[in-house]
Amino acid sequence: MSAILSADDLNDFISPGVACIKPIETLPAKPEDSSNPYEVTTEDKAAASQPPPPASISLTDCLACSGCVTSAEAVLVSLQSHSEVLTTLDTYRSLRAPWQTQNGTNGTNGTNGTTNGHSTNGTTTNGINGHSHEGKLFVASVSPQSRASIAAVFNVSEAEAGNMIAQLLSGPSGLKTGGHQGSDFTWVLDTNVVREACLVAAADEVANALSPETSNPSTKPGSEGAIDTTPKQPILTSACPGWICYAEKTHPYILPHLSRLKSPQALTGTLIKSVLSQQYNIPPSQIWHVAIMPCFDKKLEASRSELTSSAWLPNHDATQDPVRDVDCVITARELLHLASARGINFASLPRTPLSASERTPFPDPKLDAFLFPHTRRKNQDVVAGSSGGYLYHILQTYQAQNPGSSISVSRGRNADVVEYSLVRGSETIIRAARFYGFRNIQNLVRRLKPAKASRLPGGKTGVSRKPGAAAGGDVKDYAYVEVMACPGGCTNGGGQVKITEVEEVRAYEGVESTNGDTLAPKPGPKEQKEWLAKVDEAYFSGSDSEEEKVDQDGDQNMQDATTNGHTSEPDIVNGISRRKINDVVAHWSHLTGVDTQKLLYTSYRKVESDVGKKQSDMERVAGLAVTVGGGW
């Protein structure tokens, strides 16, 4: 959503609707002094004599407008920035993990009786001064799209960019070198690892929805989008917050089609908060999680009331304020501001991974092996797209279950509409599609809109032109549709380093352009397309570089288990073992005592517009701006 609401990209520009109230929410200009001080002028005449100022609507206006997004959400977005990261690090001391070796003992401090993270009185101390309430446990998660943006700017590989980010957040020459507390992040996680669980769960969700035995309770009034309902065909991806915001506010009939699966960002936050708070008896509020994402809309996702501790915390006290699973979201551009504010030259950071001796093991051994594997699986092939590869993994899963089948790919009306079919001979096993960009999303939701009932007695329903009569057939024949708000996918997110900023960043960091990589002073559409291709190249580069295959401890670090849908182990698809993922999820559920449904899935709801409502309702919505949390 963020990347397209601008006049620079008219192909996907959405003009304000008739309900847009932003142009009239401006104060009248100060009237000029009248030459006749005794002249009486009515208010209407005074307003009519002054030309109205030109209406200018920006993305910030849209986020702050109660006609689409509540003002509370605009406040929540503004609070999430690199400044908040620095303020939090400077305010709270990093909690020393109680399971670390201290004073020659393993997780036990002889002065306060703390053993394995638990004190004798049931409270956790930090193993240093016994005042855990004065500190926080800092955790960061990084998306591959953000790493690709950084890689393109600094002419490094995606893996090297990830190492530089980890060195900034956790390394000896990173954030800990400045600030009042010397705090840094205990763990830096790769969301690609958690995405594997999302891909497996997405394939299972589609299989369950298409099963003839599945009863779909989502058709009951009021249950649309509920966590315990099965989505209707076609199932629509729910990992893009810009798309979800649009659907909830403008097209509630889409809610039964939305996947109930959490995004990798949300799932990572749930895993971090639920495991650490339960294992070491510390409240979720003492675990501070920042996510580095390619999109500004991810800040809104982090603010959803459904993605808080109240959704999974056993015996949650309703009188207590819930804690977000993701406390703050910053983008790739804001990450560079973070380093600059600390006086750190990002380009000079080591491009090698943190050694095993510098990394704190995750408290649970099985989850530690899952989150920090010895082998790092690269991003999927180009055909899978740059938005996580949900659709393609589902197709590959069905392909593995149907030997002799093949995936047919055909382009739609433009490059951001692609149709997929899994065929075996003349039989079509499953159909799916990809719709990127709001221009194409509008076509999709229009074709999914239910036909209006005839007002004439005995009249037929839908006798007019069907919404799905456009080229490409009926979208209801698709089993799954991957929907992303940004044209080109997540590598083109609004939070990525823009082409107009690249040379400025390189000059500031002292990075020289190589191989004719110098960008034009005023890049046009052609240069923007070439830059996005460079970011995509970094995203898909994976393990092409030999030096990335071995870390500082000599471990092989960049190998794939498999790259096709057919292996000797039937449950392995594109290097992801369904059996292993399900085992990890079951272990996570057992460890925390939380049902897997609450851990993996979420819900969606229709959001009413505040335009045209009485003043008391407007005041009620405005009051949400002072609360912590809140949904769309």
From Swiss-Prot:
Positions of the region Disordered? 27-53, 99-119, 210-231, 542-573
Q: Where does [4Fe-4S] cluster 2 bind?
A: 240, 295, 486, 490
* Biological process terms in GO annotation: iron-sulfur cluster assembly
Gene Ontology molecular function, alphabetical? 4 iron, 4 sulfur cluster binding; iron-sulfur cluster binding; metal ion binding
The yes or no answer to whether the keyword Iron-sulfur is present is yes
Q: Where does [4Fe-4S] cluster 1 bind?
A: 20, 62, 65, 68
Q: Which domain of life is it from?
A: Eukaryota
Ranges annotated as biased composition (Polar residues):
211-221, 555-567
Name the residue ranges with Acidic residues bias: 544-554
Per the record, a Pfam family? Fe_hyd_lg_C
- Which residues span the membrane? none
Query: What are the Low complexity biased-composition ranges?
Result: 101-119
GO cellular component labels: cytosolic [4Fe-4S] assembly targeting complex
Keywords of the record: 4Fe-4S, Iron, Iron-sulfur, Metal-binding
Give the family from UniProt: Belongs to the NARF family.
Its function, per the record, reads: Component of the cytosolic Fe/S protein assembly machinery. Required for maturation of extramitochondrial Fe/S proteins. May play a role in the transfer of pre-assembled Fe/S clusters to target apoproteins.
**Protein name per Swiss-Prot or TrEMBL:** Cytosolic Fe-S cluster assembly factor NAR1
Species the sequence originates in? Phaeosphaeria nodorum (strain SN15 / ATCC MYA-4574 / FGSC 10173)
Q: Gene encoding it?
A: NAR1
